[in-house]
Amino acid sequence: ALLPTASSFAMSTVFKALLWLAAAAGLLYLAGCSLMYAQQRKIMYLPQYTQVAADQTNFSLQRPDALLRGWQVHPSTDMNNPTTPVVVYFGGNGEDVRYAMPQLQQALPQSHLYTLSYRGYGASEGEPSEDALVDDALALFDVLRARHAHNPITVIGTSLGSGVAAAVAKQRQPDKLLLVTPFDSALNVARHMLPWLPVSLLLKDRYDSVSRLQSYQGPVL
């Protein structure tokens, strides 16, 4: 039998090393995918910048599993005036929505203004997810529709809130919809930011605004 030459032995060693490196890289990639899947909502949502004491809020919405808190501002006109517009604001990710109220009040002084902090944001209880945020937003809309039965309702959404607002627009058909710095879908945003990960397989909360808005019949501003 022929003895292996030094060059063939070296090639075998290099090949084995490459196999080990490929296996290690594959394991690291799978570990990264697993971590992304398990921790994505902690990465995606940023409530830590929005915390506020409950006694600094003046509006709340009781949900089956959480108490949500926020703010309401009303004009000096009669609360029951059916011509007074109602404006619902859904804030951006990491936005302290209480600071949006003075700006909205200045821009829309003759409107009823409402906003809630998302679950886990501000003084609201619970953990954020797309399903939870959308369900909460629909519940808020229903409460306001019952409170202001004949008033026109405008829904405003900024950034993350544009995804929530699009879901409300699809299912509740508000009179007007205003989207500020919107995105087409969270999936496409994630694909752009993390092109090396199979985000279409991993992402739980997709906020597919383009698809949802196809069902909205009102004006989009």
Segment roles from a protein language model:
Residues 199-221:
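The feature captures the conserved acid-bearing segment of alpha/beta-hydrolase catalytic domains
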Residues 174, 178-188, 205-209:
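Active-site nucleophile loop of the alpha/beta-hydrolase fold
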Residues 157-161, 165:
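Gly/Ala-rich beta-loop-alpha elbow adjacent to hydrolase catalytic centers
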Residues 155-157, 180:
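Short beta-strand immediately N-terminal to the catalytic nucleophile in serine-hydrolase-like folds
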Residues 167-175:
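Conserved hydrolase catalytic core segment
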Residues 67-143, 147, 151, 163, ...:
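Membrane-embedded segments
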Residues 130, 183-202:
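Flexible "cap/lid" loop of the alpha/beta hydrolase fold
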Residues 17, 21-62:
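An N-terminal hydrophobic leader/cap segment in hydrolases
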